[in-house]
Swiss-Prot record:
One of its GO terms (biological process) is dimethylallyl diphosphate biosynthetic process. Dimethylallyl diphosphate binds at H50, H83, H133, S231, S232, N233, S276. Its cofactor is [4Fe-4S] cluster. (2E)-4-hydroxy-3-methylbut-2-enyl diphosphate binds at H50, H83, H133, T173, S231, S232, N233, S276. [4Fe-4S] cluster binds at C21, C105, C203. Isopentenyl diphosphate binds at H50, H83, H133, S231, S232, N233, S276. The keyword Zinc does not apply. It catalyses: isopentenyl diphosphate + 2 oxidized [2Fe-2S]-[ferredoxin] + H2O = (2E)-4-hydroxy-3-methylbut-2-enyl diphosphate + 2 reduced [2Fe-2S]-[ferredoxin] + 2 H(+); dimethylallyl diphosphate + 2 oxidized [2Fe-2S]-[ferredoxin] + H2O = (2E)-4-hydroxy-3-methylbut-2-enyl diphosphate + 2 reduced [2Fe-2S]-[ferredoxin] + 2 H(+). HAMAP family: IspH (MF_00191). Catalyzes the conversion of 1-hydroxy-2-methyl-2-(E)-butenyl 4-diphosphate (HMBPP) into a mixture of isopentenyl diphosphate (IPP) and dimethylallyl diphosphate (DMAPP). Acts in the terminal step of the DOXP/MEP pathway for isoprenoid precursor biosynthesis. NCBIfam families: ispH_lytB (TIGR00216), PRK01045.1-2 (NF002188), PRK01045.1-3 (NF002189), PRK01045.1-4 (NF002190). This is 4-hydroxy-3-methylbut-2-enyl diphosphate reductase. It holds the Pfam family LYTB.
């Protein structure tokens, strides 16, 4: 009689932190509160956050997502997404007599303010980011004559500045930390006097989620990142997992997108989610994996997050006014 070989226990390593960051949480709640406060429709310029499920859920509640301000009927309410907008967009909204609610993430606003400040001092600003991303378009719009985009280390050779003693780098908030520093190092080799921003532009949540996914990659044969294909921070997490040694890593919006073939020979699955992803989607993946024998779930914690941001000021003002009116009755 042959000896029985024990099957290795299948398990899931669940990253913590994962999912919603403070800026996304604030933006999503802002749309929900605006719908409650003013009624549908609430127009939102671009997807409020880059997640298919979140956008579809808010559409069902009465949010209408538009690509350009001209699509918003005059006199309506328009909310700007968490990614931020250029000053020209604020001007367009004023021209159309739109009531605006600015749900730009405060960490993106910080980069906007840095751009304005350095442009005022006549610096050449090298903005590290991905061409066409809404956040990059918004930041570039703050100082179009001073900002040039650097889309990775391979772009550095083409960068030219007016005065090498007055150059500063800024970055999109959702990039790979490692790749950004590689770009910065290349820029510093070319421009030794390159100035750095006063504090990191890459946001705390992006950094924390990348650190967590690196930890998963140490032990998992497969890493699944829940997130949308247009989510910069989610895409970066797949890249970071592969760079950190994970044999395979994939991005999915929903559990139904997972290919059973990915699990072949896999005993340990690493699971995390992008900063725009509600936990209900991660729960769906856990359930799907559980049905296939990956019932043992172990949380891998690499950081605590307690940051919260207050709602956009326009919304806070109206909510306060309503509360005051109710208490006066």
């Amino acid at each position: 009689m042959g000896r029985m070989t024990a099957t290795p226990a299948r398990r899931v390593l669940l990253a913590a932190p994962r999912g919603y960051c403070a800026g996304v949480d604030r933006a999503v709640i802002a749309v929900e509160k605006a719908l409650e406060q003013y009624g549908a429709p609430i127009y939102v310029r671009h997807e409020i956050v880059h997640n298919k499920y979140v956008v579809q859920t808010l559409e069902k509640k009465g949010a209408i997502f538009v690509d350009v301000t001209a699509e918003v009927p005059e006199g309506s309410i328009v909310m700007f997404s968490a990614h931020g907008v250029a000053p020209t967009v604020h001007a367009e909204a004023a021209e159309r007599k739109l009531a605006t609610i600015d749900a730009t993430c405060p960490l993106v606003t910080k980069v906007h303010k840095e751009a304005v400040r350095y442009a005022k001092d006549d610096y050449d600003i090298l903005l590290i980011g991905h061409e066409g991303h809404e956040e990059v378009i918004g930041t570039s719009g703050e100082a179009p004559d001073h900002i040039q985009l650097v889309d990775g280390p391979e772009d550095v050779a083409n960068v030219e500045v007016r005065d090498e003693s007055k150059v500063v780098w800024l970055s999109q908030t959702t990039l790979s930390v490692d790749e950004t520093m590689e770009t910065v190092d290349a820029l510093k080799s070319k421009f030794p006097n390159l100035l750095s921003p006063p504090s990191d532009d890459i946001c705390y949540a992006t950094q924390n989620r990348q650190i967590a996914v690196k930890k998963l990659a140490e032990d998992a044969e497969l890493v699944i990142v829940v997130g949308s294909k247009n989510s910069s921070n989610s895409i970066r997490m797949v890249e970071v997992a592969l760079d950190a040694g994970a044999p395979a890593a994939h991005l999915v919006d929903f559990a139904s997108e997972i290919d059973e073939a990915w699990l072949e020979g896999v005993t340990t699955v690493g699971l995390t989610s992008g900063a725009s992803v509600p936990d209900v989607l991660v729960d769906g993946v856990l359930e799907w994996l559980g049905e296939r024998g990956y019932a043992d779930v172990e949380t891998v914690k690499t950081a605590d997050e307690s940051i919260t941001f207050s709602l956009p000021k326009e919304l806070r003002r109206d909510l306060r006014a309503e509360a005051a009116a109710l208490s006066a009755e």
